[in-house]
């Protein structure tokens, strides 16, 4: 595993879970965290520890977004009508980087963020280079014409390890995706259990 790949799996190692369900994740081979003390048996987590871990998993899945940005997203979810945890999932899944990743235009969420930053993506026909850009139902995301033959894109489309969720309609021949609806927690194909209700409890302390 290259140094770059290893860095991407740091979150997996820290949490002790393969949060993206990737075959090369180091936690597929061991059940302890990174570092010289990683093999020590972990004690039972406190309620706070359980809530913190749930937050770290959700933050980590979306590319380890900053605490400031994650809390801002939570606060927006809390202001909206309905279940705050479900609102949080909907907001996270409507991020441009999440949709580019879910559409299988790139292999990882980290690659999605870089891909967007480098200007390879259009939304409704206009280039957008902000990874946290919030999509609305019906928005069309497309790999820019000059970027469609990039190796990273051609390889990602063929990945068998994950499927495109049904709230994103994708044409892989044209490399176009439509964000068709806001998903609920049960719609989202997480590789591990995500518990947004515990994230709500964490911020409600």
Curated annotation (Swiss-Prot):
UniProt-listed GO biological process terms: ribosomal small subunit biogenesis; translation
Pfam families, alphabetized: Ribosomal_S4 (PF00163), S4 (PF01479)
Molecular function per GO: rRNA binding; structural constituent of ribosome
Entry GO terms, CC: small ribosomal subunit
Region ranges (Disordered): 19-45
S4 RNA-binding domain location: 94-157
Recorded superkingdom: Bacteria
PROSITE patterns: RIBOSOMAL_S4 (PS00632), S4 (PS50889)
The entry's keywords: Ribonucleoprotein, Ribosomal protein, RNA-binding, rRNA-binding
Family the entry assigns: Belongs to the universal ribosomal protein uS4 family.
Subunit architecture: Part of the 30S ribosomal subunit. Contacts protein S5. The interaction surface between S4 and S5 is involved in control of translational fidelity.
Function: One of the primary rRNA binding proteins, it binds directly to 16S rRNA where it nucleates assembly of the body of the 30S subunit. With S5 and S12 plays an important role in translational accuracy.
Official protein name in the record: Small ribosomal subunit protein uS4
Organism annotation: Brucella anthropi (strain ATCC 49188 / DSM 6882 / CCUG 24695 / JCM 21032 / LMG 3331 / NBRC 15819 / NCTC 12168 / Alc 37)
């Amino acid at each position: 595993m290259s140094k770059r790949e290893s860095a991407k799996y740091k979150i997996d190692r820290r949490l002790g879970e393969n949060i993206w369900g990737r075959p090369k994740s180091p936690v597929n081979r061991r059940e302890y965290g990174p570092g010289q003390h990683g093999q020590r048996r972990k004690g039972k987590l406190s309620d706070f520890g359980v809530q913190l871990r749930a937050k770290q998993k959700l933050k980590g899945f979306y590319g380890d977004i900053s605490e400031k940005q994650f809390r801002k997203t939570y606060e927006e979810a809390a202001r909206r009508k309905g279940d705050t945890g479900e609102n949080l999932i909907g907001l996270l899944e409507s991020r441009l980087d999440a949709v580019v990743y879910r559409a299988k235009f790139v292999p990882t969420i980290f690659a999605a963020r870089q891909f967007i930053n480098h200007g390879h993506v259009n939304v409704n026909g206009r280039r957008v280079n902000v990874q946290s850009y919030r999509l609305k139902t019906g928005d069309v995301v497309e790999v820019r014409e000059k970027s469609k033959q990039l190796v990273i894109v051609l390889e990602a489309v063929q990945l068998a390890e994950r499927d495109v969720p049904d709230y994103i309609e994708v044409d892989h021949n044209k490399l176009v995706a439509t964000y068709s609806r806001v998903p609920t927690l049960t719609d989202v194909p997480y590789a591990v259990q995500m518990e947004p209700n515990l994230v709500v409890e964490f911020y409600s302390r």
